Amino acid sequence: MFVLDTKVVSTFRKATPHPAVTPWIAQTGWQAIATTVITIIELQRGVERARVQHPYVADNVERWLTGLLAAGTPQVLPMGVMAARLLGRMHETPALRHFILTDPQAKEQATGADLAIAAIAITAGAAVATGNAKHFLQINAWFPLPGLFDPMAQAWHVTVV
């Protein structure tokens, strides 16, 4: 199974999705693809941030997100107890603190989302599918991922165990 991160799920919304993602999903099949509640949180955060300056965009993205969730594909994995405990361990790993602590003046604040997505994927025994392998490779150094795949580059960074 693959767990899609926010960057990959966001490509579904584009008028012209990344040319490698659509065929990869068709080949893999929705039954082997999921995302997480963390990605839903990140997508909703994006809607709320856009609502102030770009309400039309926010409304469009919210409609898209509502439709995606109603369709049931990809399935959405919850944050279970084992993933929550693993995430707690990740938060207390000094080498990973930059995922949750950032400079208050930074344009984008760290949310810990990649840690949470990784924790859910690890406890589900699923490979992470991301367009941002760098972050997940940092996590993998401390908490081995079952797999790490970039569907945009069609490249495995951590092969399935």
Set out the residue ranges of the language-model regions.
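Short, well-structured N-terminal submotif of metal-dependent ribonuclease cores
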Residues: 1-42, 47-65, 157
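Alpha-helix capping/helix-boundary segments
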Residues: 8, 39, 83, 117, ...
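Residues that scaffold the ATP/ADP-binding catalytic core of kinase and kinase-like folds
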Residues: 11-12, 46, 87-90, 139
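Short active-site oxyanion
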Residues: 31-33, 73-75, 122-127
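Short, hinge-like loop/turn segments at secondary-structure boundaries
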Residues: 51-54, 94-95, 145-149
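Acidic catalytic patch
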Residues: 70-106
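Acidic donor-binding loop at a coil-to-helix junction in glycosyltransferase catalytic cores
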Residues: 112-113
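Acidic, PIN/NYN-like endoribonuclease modules and their adjacent C-terminal/linker elements
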Residues: 118-161
